[in-house]
Amino acid sequence: MAAEEVTLSSHIQHHLTNAKMCSTDAGLAFNKACADSGFWTWHVDTLAWSIGLGLIFLWIFRSAAKKSTLGVPGKFQCFIEIIVEFVGDNVRDTFHGKSKLIAPLALTIFVWVFLMNLMDLIPVDFLPSFAGFVGETAFGMDSHDVYMKIVPTTDINMTSALALGVFILMVGFAIKIKGIGGFIKELTLHPFSSNNVFVQILLIPFNLLLELIALVSKPFSLALRLFGNLYAGELIFILIGAIGFMQLPLHFVWAVFHILVITLQAFLFMMLTIVYLSMASSDNH
């Protein structure tokens, strides 16, 4: 057991494992007991951190709105206004339809994803070790059976949920602008078309297959891009932390670089969402 605890592979696996909760015939079960529970398993750390960071986002912007003034703004108000104007400019330049939903949606996505990514800069052992200490002292659990992933975007379930929301909005916008008939025509009459009715009917299955692949690949790529970059970043932090005293300068260099990564990934997720919704709202194929 001791040898297992100190191996690098077990250390990495422990840090990259979610805290799980599931329902069994015997009642609620946690972590390893949920190994065979399948789809109906809750990643409680992902849920807790993502909801908590979402509430922090709402609190920050609500506080800024309440304290805003028409006079000389303070530093906090200026900072919030810079973010709002930055997102607003990107929405105006990219989204060519008319919707009051897009700018607030883009702002929410950018800030929320950024805050979730930002958790990757917290030392990898700090909060998981604290959770293990609490589990061991307060609940008599083995600290190695206590899991906590503090970066929600390193969980494919979280990024998939975000991408699924974008996908639903894409389909909703397309149906709202083009109607159900127009949406079906877009899926079945493009990219191949013919003036011959019989040929066009024969082309429908091929068009439908290609358009469905193109449609589904958009949220799929959104989810995997965000997850892959943040998961790899977290893994590198763990590997750096395993090399001893030399980790400090390497941690600093990687953290500085990773600040760019987490910001860029939040920006890309926001921009691609705007682009996809703009494409869905366009009357032109």
UniProtKB/Swiss-Prot annotation:
Gene3D superfamilies: ATP synthase, F0 complex, subunit A
Gene Ontology molecular function terms on file: proton-transporting ATP synthase activity, rotational mechanism
Alphabetized Pfam families for the sequence: ATP-synt_A (PF00119)
Protein name: ATP synthase subunit a
Keyword annotations: ATP synthesis, Cell inner membrane, Cell membrane, CF(0), Hydrogen ion transport, Ion transport, Membrane, Transmembrane, Transmembrane helix, Transport
Domain of life: Bacteria
Gene: atpB
Organism of derivation: Pseudoalteromonas translucida (strain TAC 125)
Function description: Key component of the proton channel; it plays a direct role in the translocation of protons across the membrane.
